């Protein structure tokens, strides 16, 4: 019912496994802290956010056939944890990476994802806005080398980065500047050939089954 989007005292809203849900009403739930829409297999559009929702901390959109996220998604200014596992999103605006409180982003198995396709004029903003994401997973997302070309440097506050089973051929030199990064996992990246830099405070680096890794990169890792 459309009134659900205006229940101002609602703190938790879970509609998981509502397989016949096709439309979700616009939201202006100022008290909402947790929204779960995972496994709503017929929901192709994320609802419009009509105003700032400062209290929403966690959003689960796993296993949804979403095509994109609306511009109003940025009204979720308090969002801390975003789960997009196996989500159908084909376009992910890079401005979301810079949402002020977002700290955990899990996007495993978003295989059709075109990473950070910038909106017109957005790239200039990206060079200034920093990300607070410290735990980022994009395993099995079909990521290629262009993943590192646009907004990757925004993520320099990360502590954990998981990029297993992707298609890029190198790790960029700029990753040397990621001084907070402790755990990095690129296992199963069969095309990875070159590691151009290693974060200075890394304590756990996994590159299992990276069968194309050059001998010089392998030696560099062994000497760390």
Q: Each predicted region: which residue ranges?
A:
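Leucine-rich repeat
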Residues: 1-4, 9-50, 55-73, 78-177, ...
């Amino acid at each position: 019912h459309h009134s659900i989007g205006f229940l101002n005292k609602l703190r938790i809203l879970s509609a998981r496994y509502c397989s016949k849900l096709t439309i979700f009403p616009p939201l202006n739930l100022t008290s909402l802290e947790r929204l779960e829409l995972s496994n709503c297999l017929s929901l192709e559009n994320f609802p419009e956010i009509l105003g700032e929702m400062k209290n929403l901390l966690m959003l689960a959109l796993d296993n949804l056939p979403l095509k994109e996220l609306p511009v109003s998604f940025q009204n979720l200014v308090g969002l801390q944890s975003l789960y997009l596992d196996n989500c159908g999103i084909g376009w992910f605006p890079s401005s979301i990476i810079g949402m002020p409180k977002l700290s955990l982003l899990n996007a495993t198995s978003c295989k059709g994802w075109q990473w950070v396709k910038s909106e017109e004029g957005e790239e200039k903003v990206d060079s200034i806005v920093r990300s607070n994401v410290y735990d980022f997973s994009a395993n099995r997302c079909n990521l290629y080398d262009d993943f590192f070309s646009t907004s990757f440097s925004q993520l320099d506050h990360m502590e954990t980065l998981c990029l297993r089973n992707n298609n890029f051929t190198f790790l960029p030199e700029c990753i040397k500047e990621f001084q907070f990064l402790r755990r990095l996992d690129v296992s199963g990246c069969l095309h990875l050939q070159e590691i151009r830099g290693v974060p200075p405070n890394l304590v756990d680096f996994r590159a299992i089954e990276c069968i194309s890794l050059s001998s010089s990169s392998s030696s560099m890792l062994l000497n760390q």
